């Protein structure tokens, strides 16, 4: 079986970036496959044959290059396995030619991975995760056999939808994957990589109404009054849910990344990671009660004890913590006699529901939650006075 090694060639000019390339060996014949991945010598780990991803200003770029490199290696492995399965001889040149033909012809796998890498480079980690999840599902459907963008048609999408439903996916789940694939397809159309074939016209791409996830104020009050002092994991989960509710339904990823410096002069200021919108919240006593409950770590820049220190796998750690919290919230729901399947996302819905119950205009509640889609939330003008939203929030918290 052929082998592939990652190599780095430093620049002959001091201070210039070097180039990463792949060394392919088959039957003792060596071929080189060039890439356009350029890094500095001190960004390459010679022993591990990988890029050193740090917290510098080039961190996102290096992470993107490392993941593109890992994807290339996966593609090369798939190509080699497919050639092996043919039970016919092949050369190192055949491997290189197959790799380059998919790249030049813009295969779906390769094109999507390029989008994922760019999303991560831009810091849009959650969106990149959604695209990665879709790519993984589509690759499983295809049995790791790549397909050109020009070969995407209605029949293929209908087969993929049937495959998803056969695996037990509900319509909203299959629609989630289809909408992402449609976005990928449209991006390829913009780049004029193929002609429009309307491949999604016979598959479902809508959103079915789901069970409401809002929790009434009376239930939140029961949750707040639970004595969980002997169950610290449940207490932490409850506190994170309440903090989200107190801060107008702040998303958990925004909570996790709050910095101590974001709280100043009685106001909490942060930028939504999903939309980039800047929000300012008046600091209330209930918020302080939660923050004050947990010992301050002088070495950590974060306001809440979700993330400890900035590190490479911050997002992975955040996801693990959120998973544990959501799991514990199910037990809290049982203890507080709450029938809704409780999760951190419920806090966001619950604040909006409470605002509606107080006859607070939707324009005010949508501003409070940081929505930016006029079609879904009728967002107020960006110049809306923050005091209006703070007053609405204080009105809700008084009932707890």
What does each model-identified segment do?
Residues 280-285, 289, 293-294, 382-400:
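DNA/chromatin major-groove-contacting recognition/catalytic segments
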Residues 220, 284-339:
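Active-site/catalytic core of tyrosine-dependent DNA strand-transfer enzymes
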Residues 158-160, 194-225, 309-317:
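Flexible interdomain linker/hinge and immediately adjacent N-terminus
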Residues 261-269, 338-340, 360-379:
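Short, polar N-cap/turn motifs at the start of nucleic acid-interacting alpha helices
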Residues 134-141, 147-151, 155-158, 166-199, ...:
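N-terminal DNA-binding recognition helix of tyrosine site-specific recombinases/integrases
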Residues 272-276, 369-394:
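Catalytic-site neighborhood detector that most strongly recognizes the C-terminal catalytic loop/helix
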Residues 25-29, 81-167:
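Basic/aromatic-enriched alpha-helical hairpins
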Residues 229-232, 297, 326-367:
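Short, basic (Lys/Arg/His-rich) helix/loop patches that form interaction surfaces
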């Amino acid at each position: 079986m052929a082998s592939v090694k990652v190599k780095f060639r430093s620049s002959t000019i001091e201070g210039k970036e070097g180039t990463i390339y792949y060394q392919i060996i088959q039957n003792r014949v060596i071929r080189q496959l060039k890439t356009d991945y350029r890094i500095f010598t001190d960004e390459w780990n010679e022993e591990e044959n990988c890029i050193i991803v740090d917290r510098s200003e080039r961190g996102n770029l290096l992470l993107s290059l490392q993941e593109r490199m890992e994807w290339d290696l996966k593609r090369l492995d798939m190509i080699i396995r497919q050639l092996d399965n043919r039970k016919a001889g092949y050369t190192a040149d055949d491997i290189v030619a197959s790799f380059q033909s998919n790249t030049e012809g813009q295969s779906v796998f390769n094109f999507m991975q390029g989008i994922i890498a760019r999303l991560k480079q831009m810091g849009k980690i959650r969106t990149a995760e959604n695209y990665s999840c879709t790519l993984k599902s589509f690759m499983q459907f295809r049995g790791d056999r790549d397909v050109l963008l020009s070969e995407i048609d209605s029949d293929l999408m209908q087969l993929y939808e049937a495959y998803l439903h056969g695996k037990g996916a509900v319509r909203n789940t299959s629609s989630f994957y289809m909408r992402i694939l449609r976005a990928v397809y449209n991006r390829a159309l913009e780049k004029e990589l193929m002609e429009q074939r309307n491949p999604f016209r016979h598959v479902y791409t809508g959103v079915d109404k789901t069970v409401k996830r809002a929790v009434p104020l009376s239930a939140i009050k029961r949750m707040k009054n639970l004595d969980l002092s002997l169950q610290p994991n449940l207490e932490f989960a409850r506190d994170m849910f309440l903090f989200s509710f107190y801060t107008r339904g702040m998303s958990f990823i925004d909570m996790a990344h709050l910095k101590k410096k974001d709280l100043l002069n009685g106001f909490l200021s942060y930028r939504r990671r999903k939309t980039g919108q800047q929000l300012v919240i008046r600091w209330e006593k209930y918020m302080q009660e939660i923050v004050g409950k947990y010992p301050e770590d002088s070495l950590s820049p974060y306001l809440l004890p979700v993330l400890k220190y900035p590190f490479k796998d911050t997002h992975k750690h955040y996801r693990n913590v959120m998973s544990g919290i959501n799991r514990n919230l199910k037990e809290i729901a049982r203890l507080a006699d709450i029938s809704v399947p409780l999760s951190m996302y419920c806090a966001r819905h619950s604040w909006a529901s409470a605002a509606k119950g107080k006859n607070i205009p939707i324009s005010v509640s949508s501003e409070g939650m940081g929505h930016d889609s006029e079609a879904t939330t009728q967002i107020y003008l960006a110049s809306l006075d923050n005091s209006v939203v703070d007053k609405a929030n204080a009105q809700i918290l008084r009932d707890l």
